[in-house]
Amino acid sequence: GMNKIIKYIGASAVICLMAGCTTNFEDFNTNPYQPSKVPANTLLSGMFNVYAAPMQNDCQHINCMWACFSGQITAPSTWSKGENLFAYYNAMEDHNAATWAKIYARIYPNFFRIEEATEKKGVIYAMAQLTRIYAMQMMASLQGPIPYSKVKSGDIRAAYDDEPTAWRAMFDDLDNVIAILKSAAELGINQDLAAVDQFYGGNCEKWMKFANTLKLRMAIRVSGVADYAQAKAEEAVRGGVLESVSDSSYDTTSSGINENGYAIVSGWGEVRANACITSYMNGYKDPRRSAYFTKQAAGFSEDYVGVRSGSSVAPNPSDYQNYSNLMITTDKTLPQPVMYAAEAAFLRAEGVRQASSNSSGVLIPIAINFGA
């Protein structure tokens, strides 16, 4: 009697509740303040921070700490507990790890989402791949072997590639990028890219030149494998590299935290000119010294004196405050350079210097005149 009726009513209520929950599941379990699907070009804009340090702390961790190896800048600071350990090839692990963390974290989460959204096709995917390659060739130059070809979406860990494997994989991926950008360049400005592109405003022809210049840079980096490097260098130049000032790439974002890091940290005593570059430029009496550096006030006979990398004395900023600083003549809103056309010219000159007798001649040297 009544028990059966109650049982059936209860069962019906459960069924109705289950149906109701199922019907409204998306409504109840979706965050209304979070977009359900982020556009691929928006994801790409998040990756773009690897081209130029978006805040001064990144400039410290990446540009300043590693710059001693280029012979351009020395970071005589107490960041490393009183010693500039990068210059001793004995960087503290937490500072070394910062390079990995900042670069990998800015690349891979969005890169994998773009791969999925674009099905590995089109300009936005090509730009994501180009940005990944730009970041990873920098990592490989700093660290040697890196995880690259085996980095997959969803994996917590990835095996390291040895250097030949990583660099060849990057070249292969870059060739695919260049092919996509070359086709896209014939169609004019890409509007999806233009919406997020603070460098070239969606101009795929400029990005193609950028990609070829990156390829030329990478070829010079692997010049120890002579035949392979020469072939890649000549392919890059034939494909078209940066040639004019208008081709140079800058991050034009000047609001918020995206500011010129060197313009900020040079005023803190955190960086000084490196002795390598000032010594060369003094030797050649290079007229550009006054545009690059401030004059020293430490009592030396030369006007421009840099701080040596790997000094046996633990650096203290006050020890070097009167050495030549970087000449930053503008404020922190100056667009940050990413790649100059001048780099392509110097790379071509280096390519000619290293080229074998069977070179096709496309690398064309440049003339350098330092004046009297």
For the regions a language model picked out, list residue spans one by one.
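Structured, solvent-exposed acidic/aromatic patches
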Residues: 38-41, 75-372
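Sec-dependent bacterial lipoprotein signal peptides
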Residues: 1-19
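Hydrophobic alpha-helical elements and their junctions with loops/disorder across both membrane
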Residues: 17-20, 54, 184, 356
